[in-house]
Amino acid sequence: GGILNQCIHNGFGLHTFKEELTGPEYAARYITQALERKIEYKLNTMVLSISKDKHITAVNREEGLIEIDARAIILTMGCRERSRGALNIPGYRPAGIYSAGTAQRLVNLEGFMPGREVVILGSGDIGLIMARRMTLEGAHVKCVAELLPYSGGLKRNIVQCLHDYDIPLLLSHTVVDIHGRERLEGVTLAEVGPDRKPVPGSEKYIPCDTLLLSVGLLPENELSEGAEVTLDRVTGGPAVNESLETNVPGIFACGNVLHVHDLVDYVSEEAARAGRAAAKFVRGGTPKSARVVKLTGRDGVRYTVPQTVRPAAMGESVVVRFRVANPYYGKYLSCYVDGERISHRKKQIMAPGEMESFTLTREALGESAKEVVFCVEEE
């Protein structure tokens, strides 16, 4: 399972294993570790529901309906792609319109070529990687169009996937019409203004037989909602504490179901953290902490994960991850504890497509801290 099976490009494992691996190679390292430890697993098994009291209902072909009462649950459902329906693009529904992840699966796993003349809408990492993959497979990628005035992907992917293959990146552009009834025949692109609405007169028709959509990822939290887990409205994932535990005791979350990551190494790091916390919970080692410190982002910082920390349970420090709202150049990233600035670091560049991190120490929280705020400042 998992998305790594279809990510046959390299770039994985630089942080974790200090070497460059493909997605399947990276996954195989952990599969080997799980087998060596004789960890029980169930394949081809669909979880239908999780209750607040940690009762799991699942189904598979061998055992039929399965009921499991767990003492701790770690949510690792990942995320799904935003579909064409969420974009409200006018036009018919011809063949040839795919999400970038679906096209990635068709090309890398199934061996099918979705099309020959390709336009990609959205510059998320999957869209950038598929621009390169389709070019390598012999297709002609006409352009990558991005609604925002900046790319949503990693700088590394923009250089390696677009610049190296001379694929144009059209910023502040979007698809305003889709042409073709049976098969896609072309799309109309238009420039958008600061209000993100098409500029009249800027439309241009581009003939193509395939449109790939890379327009955002949504954490897959339907099961979480069934367990009455509180979700963060910005990340779309559960609100968690320093142990990655949700508001439901014994239910933890990590990876893309928690918030969308750019590097799998960070997902693995988070997963190990959630695993340790779940094991500690099962053994009854989690202290009942009265004091909870709230973490928030403002003035350029969109969110923080975790959203709260309990100083008594956090150890010496905890890694806080977050994203900025816009690209910033030569600005300062600051951290305030109850209004007092404890950190003020100059960053040459900060971009929404690249996750930032900050190590928050228990010492910095002192004995009475109530709130930690992260923000971007001019000086």
Stretches found by the model and what they are:
Residues G1-R29, R105-N108, P114-Q160, H344:
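Beta1-alpha1 glycine-rich phosphate/pyrophosphate-binding loop at the start
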Residues A27-E117, E191-G201, L212, A239-V240:
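FAD-binding core/adjacent interface of flavoenzyme oxidoreductases
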Residues A34-A58, I68, T135-E222, E316-I349:
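A Rossmann-like FAD-binding core segment of flavoenzymes
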Residues L75, I97-V107, T210-H261:
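FAD-site-proximal beta/loop scaffold in flavoenzymes
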Residues C79-E81, G124-I126, L218, L258:
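Residue-level detector of alpha-helix initiation sites
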Residues C254-T304:
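A conserved FAD-binding loop/helix module that cradles the flavin
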Residues P287-Y328:
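Surface beta-strand/loop "capping" patches
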Residues V320, L333-C335, L360-E379:
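Short, aromatic- and glycine-rich surface loops/edge beta-strands on solvent-exposed regions
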